[in-house]
A protein has these predicted regions:
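Acidic/His- and Gly-rich active-site-bordering loop/insert found
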Residues: 2-125, 132
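Active-site-proximal alpha-helical scaffold in enzymes
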Residues: 131-137
Length: 137
């Protein structure tokens, strides 16, 4: 894919609301790592969202149990194309801080992306589900 084709594809992805829809789906996972019992939702985020998405893009994915008992699982995804191409590495996390649903204003929810002017609200929109969505777009 040429540079121009790549820029056109990402522009189309963003302007068609596909980016919003994908990010909104990811924000919908209540991956609150600072609350007890969050491990199942963190695992579900990887199993149901990230692994299928990355696999569809040609990545091989392995989920490892975190050696820390108080931390979520670790996903390692790899896609090899050619020795002549550069290595690209990205890091991210799927957990967010507690949603504090009752503290959100104007009928907003931490578990849905809300656009207000040029600002997008929702747990994980900037840290770190937004990064996943941008990096792999």
């Amino acid at each position: 894919m040429s540079r121009d084709d790549a820029l056109l594809a990402i522009d189309t992805f963003y302007n068609s609301d596909a980016f919003y829809d994908l990010l909104n789906r990811r924000v919908g996972f209540r991956t609150e790592s600072n609350l007890p019992g969050c491990e199942a939702e963190l695992q579900r985020y990887l199993d149901e969202e990230m692994v299928p998405y990355l696999t569809q893009m040609g990545f091989s994915c392995v989920i490892h149990k975190n050696p820390r008992a108080d931390a979520g699982p670790i996903l390692v995804a790899q896609r090899f194309e050619d020795d002549a191409l550069p290595t690209v590495m990205t890091y991210g996390h799927g957990d967010v801080v507690a949603g504090y649903d009752e503290q959100w204003q104007d009928n907003m929810s931490p578990w849905e992306v809300t656009k207000s002017d040029d600002i997008w609200y929702g747990r994980g929109t900037a840290d770190n589900k937004g990064q996943h969505t941008i990096n792999f777009a």
